[in-house]
Each structure stands twice: as C-alpha cells, then as structure tokens.
Amino acid sequence: AGVNGTTPSVALQTRIDAAERYLKAHPDIPAVLSGGQGPGEDISEARAMYDALTDRGIDPERLILEEQSANTRQNLQNSLALLPDDYHKTVAIVTNDFHMGRVRLLLNAAGPGRVVQVPAKLPWWWLSANYYLRESFAVVNDQVVRPLLA
C-alpha cells in the first residue's frame, strides 16, 4: 500500500477507512496495524494507520503496532504473533479487495481458525466493474463459502 512521506497512499487510505468502520462496529476487539517503513516513507505503514485511526477516535489502547514487516507474509506472521492467544480463533483481515485472495491463502497456512474478511475497495474509476464483480464472487465462493460448508 505505502506511505508518501507521512500521507497514506490511496490504497492504504481505503484500508484505514475500512478498519475504522470495522473497529467502530466491534468496539471490544484489538487491532494489529502491520507494515514497515519503505524507501521514501517518513513513517511506517503501521504508524500511518495508527495516526489516522486515533485521529478518528479509535482508542490507542486497542491498537498494536507491527512495524518490522516488509511483505505480506511477514505482515501476517508478525501480526499473528502479537495477538493474544484467544484471538487466534477468529481473525479479521482488512486489506484491499484485490489483495484478499493471496492473504487468505497465506492465512490458511498460518493456521488461525475463522477468518473474517474486511475488504477495502479502491475508488479508481478505470477498474472494470465486470472484473471486480466476477472476482468478488470468486473470492467469496472460494475463500468464505467453501470453507464454511466443509
């Protein structure tokens, strides 16, 4: 997703928006904000999310920062290691919708129980509505429906 200086990229901003909605709807859960600091970034992705969410009224006591990861696999491994044991039964993942499939595959290997998907949608007009619709149904079917019916 990335940070431009200290400003979240469009992709990261959509994740922040989705995380805010989810956290406000579920006020008793903690959140691990995961993402390291890349080249050209003045702060880590995790810090950018923390700053934005606390500015929007999310209690900082609920937010756990994971600022060491450099890729999706590390994001997941490091984040799961920071969660209290009882939260491994259900994990909610907030990421961009286009990224959700790969995240789910990595999570299956990591072993948490139930995974709640919280997709963040990009606002870019040039993305094909047909492609998004088809992919959305495929991801829901493969990653949510089939495991629930198994």
List each model region and its residues.
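A transmembrane-helix-recognition feature enriched in membrane-embedded lipid enzymes
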Residues: 128-150
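A structural signal for short, hydrophobic/glycine-enriched beta-strand patches
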Residues: 1-132
